[in-house]
């Protein structure tokens, strides 16, 4: 790992020219997608783009996202019950500043990609160190990161990471339910479109 380094970028305009060559196997890490994400990101999200270098050659790219959940309206003003006030206080002070290494907007292994084989020890160390650097960036701004999530690894990657720099990281698994049951009344795609423009009773 001595000759492996990383650099964190705050803007897609600053990304190295070789970025898309490295990310050619993952459209969600290419500059076209990242530029759209940067321009259309929710107001509570900030993206960081991590270039991973061997000597001076770009060999890997990764995405990190900071979410400030205090800005979400759903956690804003609600009723004034004591339980709600306590919950909001705890949330605001202990869980509202979240850093994702990976893409919080989509599911799947879209957090990083390499143009060459890199061992899991090196990858896990780079991800941990880049998270630490981003946490330090926010600390300088007076923002404490409450939660760090390393998101969406393949099963074999997650297992290998647990044996490396992620050995003390709490692991949880969830799989979105992609099952969508169609009402019997939908016989054509027009029925589907109509359902979106029809008011429910």
Give, region by region, the residue ranges found by the protein language model.
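N-acyltransferase acceptor-side catalytic subdomain
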Residues: 1-201
